[in-house]
Design a protein with these regions (language model features):
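Flexible, glycine-rich active-site loops centered on histidine and acidic residues
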Residues: 100-136
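Condensing-enzyme catalytic core mediating Claisen C-C bond formation in acyl metabolism
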Residues: 1-23, 125-230, 234, 316, ...
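Short acidic, glycine/serine/threonine-rich loops at helix termini
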Residues: 62-64, 121-125, 322-326
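Acidic-glycine-rich active-site phosphate/pyrophosphate-binding loop
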Residues: 2-8, 60-74, 111-117, 198-209, ...
């Protein structure tokens, strides 16, 4: 199908295996993840009043995936809509839900990242088809009265300087978009026509794909690498500054699982211990918006996340988009 080898893929990406859905869709995967998250959180579907589905691979235009998930799981009281920020989607959705909770517009939110990217890759294109997998992950977040605790900084200043931060939840964030880089990573939709259109509209936007593979994911891998290794550390440092914390204060960095080399480079640029950057891409590949929640679930089930841990979530994707948030588990 494509000229490559297991050794070539592992050496350049760190990916050893991925999963391709057969019969499942973005919605069925999202609904399954949602049910498991609700069970783990001890919540009934009727208690959820906000559902956000982050995806860039929906199987239909209308209705949105979130509304279909709402119907599937019986969350009759939930406002539901989708968020498309590609691989940054889960972070953008999580911060959107956080805003709803802080404003008192919701009490319990369900955030899902779900992708079936196997249908969007050209299986003869070695630069993209080796990367992406299918899957979904979900989290439940709830509004609560923020407890506070003292956090000491430094050594000599520990007795005189302290900062009050919430005992749980998001402490700081940084979210950015750069539409000028849209052509770096893109996937065109099927052309839509009307009976009144005499000819197909010419593509004049340089950010729009214009070749025979326009309906598949197209990526400038080198440019994506340069963007990620430069901007992800900057975004993390910005979020840490917003939280009043430093790299050394963080127990774990949960990054979008795109490429092992990118994660290595981010850790190096932050001067952080590589052991604090867990990965699962060797088993699942790049799950786009699902990568962070799937990894969080694995870490939680493995007992590697503990109440009170300070963690950083960070991701980047098409748009170009990038985001990071600091939170207490």
């Amino acid at each position: 199908m494509v000229e490559t080898s297991d050794e070539w893929i592992r050496e350049r990406t760190g990916i050893g295996e991925r999963h391709v859905s057969v019969g499942e869709t973005v919605v069925t995967l999202a609904s399954e993840a949602a049910r498991k998250a609700l069970e783990q959180a001890g919540k009934r579907a009727e208690e959820i009043d906000l559902i956000l589905v982050a995806t860039c691979s929906p199987e239909q235009y209308l209705p949105c995936c979130a509304c279909r998930v709402q119907a599937d799981i019986g969350a009759v009281n939930a406002l539901a809509f989708d968020v498309n920020a590609a691989c940054s989607g889960f972070l953008f959705a999580l911060n959107t839900a956080d805003a709803y909770l802080r404003m008192g517009l919701a009490e319990n939110a369900l955030i899902i990242g779900s992708e079936v990217l196997s249908k969007l890759v050209d299986w003869t294109d070695r630069s993209s088809c080796i990367l992406f997998g299918d899957g979904a992950g979900a989290v439940v977040v709830e509004r609560c009265k923020a407890e506070s605790r003292a956090v000491e900084y430094g050594n000599a200043l520990a007795e005189t300087e302290e900062k009050r931060i919430p005992a749980a939840g998001i402490l700081g964030r940084a979210l950015h978009s750069d539409g000028t880089g849209g052509g770096v990573l893109q996937c065109g939709a099927r052309e839509l026509t009307t009976p009144y259109a005499r000819t197909s509209a010419a593509k004049t936007d340089q950010n729009q794909p214009a070749n025979d593979r326009e309906h598949y994911i197209q990526m400038d891998g080198q440019e994506v690498y340069r963007f990620a290794t430069r901007r992800v550390p900057q975004c993390i440092e910005e979020a840490l500054s917003d939280a009043g914390l430093a790299v050394a204060d963080i127990d774990m960095f949960v990054l979008h699982q795109a490429n092992a080399r990118i994660i290595d480079a981010v850790a190096k640029r932050l001067h952080a211990d590589r052991e604090k950057f867990p990965t699962n891409l060797e088993r699942v590949g790049n799950l786009s918006s699902a990568s962070i929640p799937v990894l969080l679930d694995e870490l939680h089930r493995q007992g590697k996340l503990h109440r009170g841990d300070r963690i950083v979530l960070a991701g980047f994707g098409a748009g170009l988009t990038i985001g990071a948030c600091v939170m207490t588990w």
